[in-house]
């Protein structure tokens, strides 16, 4: 049978697949093969929905599909599905500009859908992302994000921030999502966002590493750099030539009062605490 503008609301709690055009066949089970469809505004292609055996005591609904569309819709899919709760709403409120593609597979036991298995692979294509308000937007983002019913991981996401390139790894542990980022930063660009005291007197670029822990849309992070490539004309002990290393450590935490707290350590030279 032909399916035209059909809706498959496959299991409670998951966004429905709509506007399906394709073929439906019935036998001991059901199979829907669709050339197109829609899920939360994202275009679907090569969609397959299968119930292998209606009479099985463990009926399984298998859903496979490819989607292309705005990254913001992919984040909304995560938020509105049970995956969102498993990763502590990691993408809730995250802003995205640009498109991408999703390969998705769902194995849904119809009698106990809480045991649904998810395998998803999302590919960012030259996106701009705003993960959390404490950090500047990431631009020219490319790479892949893998999701399951319990996890989110990424090993090869690249982009730009603070005027330099960066590479990002993502992995959730328990109710926290951990992000490790490495890159280079232009001091002038850092000053535009953070406006720390004295940064307007510095010049140059340096490599950095950040360990970020995100929980309930709040980010704690530690940023470290040896400041090689950065120079300072300030009086001693804050003067520095670009070829001399000087360990910088910035720790950010948000107390219960939601005031941002930055603890800054500059080698053996200086320490400071900034509240915003």
Where are the regions a protein language model picked out?
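Extended, hydrophobic alpha-helical segments in both membrane/secreted and soluble proteins
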Residues: 1-3, 20-22, 28-32, 140-147, ...
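Extended amphipathic, helix-rich lipid-handling scaffolds
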Residues: 1-8, 24, 29, 54-117, ...
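Solvent-exposed loop/turn segments connecting transmembrane beta-strands
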Residues: 12-14, 41-43, 132-135, 161-165, ...
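Short, surface-exposed beta-strand-loop junctions and turns on beta-sheet-rich folds
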Residues: 16, 38-41, 160-162, 174, ...
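Transmembrane beta-barrel architecture of outer membranes
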Residues: 17-21, 60, 101, 138-142, ...
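Hydrophobic residues on conserved beta-strands that form the core of alpha/beta folds
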Residues: 32-34, 44-46, 154, 259-261
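Short beta-strand segments that buttress and anchor functional surface loops
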Residues: 34-39, 156-160, 262-268
């Amino acid at each position: 049978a032909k399916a035209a503008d059909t809706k498959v609301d496959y299991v409670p709690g998951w966004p429905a697949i709509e506007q399906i055009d394709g073929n439906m066949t019935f036998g001991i089970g059901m199979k829907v093969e669709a050339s197109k469809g829609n899920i939360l505004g994202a275009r679907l292609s090569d969609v397959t929905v299968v119930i292998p055996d209606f009479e099985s005591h463990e009926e399984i609904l298998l859903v496979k599909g490819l989607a292309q569309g705005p990254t913001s819709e992919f984040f909304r899919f995560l938020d509105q599905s049970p995956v969102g709760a498993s990763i502590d709403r990691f993408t809730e409120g995250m802003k995205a500009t640009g498109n991408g593609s999703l390969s998705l597979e769902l194995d849904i036991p119809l009698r106990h859908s809480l045991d649904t298995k998810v395998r998803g692979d999302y590919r960012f294509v030259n996106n701009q992302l705003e993960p959390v308000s404490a950090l500047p937007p990431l631009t020219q983002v490319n790479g892949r994000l893998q999701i399951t019913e319990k996890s989110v991981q990424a090993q090869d996401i690249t982009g730009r921030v603070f005027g330099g390139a960066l590479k990002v790894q993502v992995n959730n542990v328990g109710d926290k999502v951990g992000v490790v980022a490495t890159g280079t930063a232009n001091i002038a660009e850092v000053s535009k966002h953070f406006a720390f005291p004295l940064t307007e007197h510095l010049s140059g670029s340096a490599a950095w590493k950040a360990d970020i822990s995100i929980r309930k849309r709040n980010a704690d992070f530690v940023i470290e750099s040896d400041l090689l490539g950065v120079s300072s004309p300030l009086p001693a002990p804050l003067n520095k030539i670009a070829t001399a290393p000087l360990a910088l450590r910035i720790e950010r935490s948000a107390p219960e009062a939601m005031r941002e707290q930055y603890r800054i350590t500059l080698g053996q030279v200086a320490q400071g605490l900034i509240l915003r």
